[in-house]
Design a protein with these regions (language model features):
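Hydrophobic heptad-repeat coiled-coil signature
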Residues: 81-84
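Hydrophobic beta-strand anchors of alpha/beta hydrolase catalytic cores
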Residues: 73-74, 104, 127
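Structural micro-motif
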Residues: 119-130
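Hydrophobic anchor residue in the Rossmann-like NAD(P) cofactor-binding loop of oxidoreductases
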Residues: 109
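Proteins that catalyze or organize thiol-disulfide redox chemistry
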Residues: 1-73, 79, 90-97, 101, ...
Length: 157
């Protein structure tokens, strides 16, 4: 960065004004960073369109995954849970209905108790909708496809 120090042009003022001049090279660097960010956003949108099946999440991938996608619906379930098995095809279909806009993830609470404990999941099935890594809505128990769709639509951009 290039800084210039100039004497203030009013008489009897003994202070200096520091003026910052942004040079062409700095502008080029800023524009390159913006371009890379835009290219990454486009790449992420294309990747999002290609996700056709729910992602299997675990204690090690959970937080990275919810922060990676702009909108992700996570199903907290267990194999012995009848209502969870009943909801599975509805949740899978929701992912297909909103493909390119929403990612669906599934986390088996029996195999991944750490995340379940951290999020205070006490009943299953529990669905939590994350927007940019933050929980914005949730549903506990068996619900209709329409109810899940309403929740998703409220948070689509």
């Amino acid at each position: 960065m290039n800084y210039q120090i100039k004497k203030h042009n009013k008489p009897n003022h003994g202070f200096f004004v520091i003026q910052h001049k942004l040079e062409d090279e700095e502008l080029r660097i800023i524009n390159e960073k913006r371009m890379k960010k835009l290219q990454q956003e486009i790449k992420d949108k294309e990747y999002l369109k290609n996700i056709k099946e729910p992602l299997n999440l675990d204690d090690t991938t959970f937080y990275q995954t919810i922060n990676k996608f702009p909108l992700i619906l996570v199903d907290f379930w267990a194999p012995w849970c009848g209502p969870c098995r009943m909801m599975a095809p509805i949740i899978d279909q929701t992912g297909k209905d909103y493909q390119g806009k929403l990612v669906v993830g599934k986390l088996n609470v029996d195999e991944n108790p750490l995340v379940a404990r951290q999020l205070a999941i006490s009943s299953i099935p529990t669905l939590i909708l994350f927007k940019r890594g933050k929980a914005v809505s949730n549903i506990v128990g068996s619900v209709s496809k329409n109810r899940i769709g309403e929740m998703v639509k409220m948070h689509l951009e």
